[in-house]
């Protein structure tokens, strides 16, 4: 993907932080801008813990295209920056290869 531009992130911070597991009702109430994968509403990112979870589970997400992974990576980068999380990865294909 070197030289290719990543899509613009769609993730936006929400007015609240949800610590811990989200209930189905809470997850259903989120807008698509809260998710790493907006179309499939996978990997909600409402706080730093959920952003780290999205990073850790990235390769486990099924039923998405490489273009959707590009967007999800952009969304994760934006959310990580917002919550003060440092990312070593510069491309989604690196997830799972640099973490100890």
Question: Where on the chain are the PLM-derived regions?
Answer:
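A charge-rich, low-complexity, intrinsically flexible signal that marks solvent-exposed coils, linkers
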Residues: 2-100
């Amino acid at each position: 993907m070197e030289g290719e531009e990543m899509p613009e992130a769609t993730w936006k911070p929400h007015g609240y932080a949800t610590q811990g597991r989200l209930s189905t009702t809470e997850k259903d109430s989120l807008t698509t801008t809260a998710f790493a994968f907006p179309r499939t509403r996978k990997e909600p990112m409402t706080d730093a813990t959920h952003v780290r979870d999205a990073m850790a589970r990235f390769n486990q997400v099924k039923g998405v295209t490489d273009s959707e992974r590009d967007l999800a990576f952009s969304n994760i980068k934006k959310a990580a920056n917002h919550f003060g999380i440092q990312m070593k990865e510069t491309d989604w294909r690196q997830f799972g290869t640099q973490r100890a």
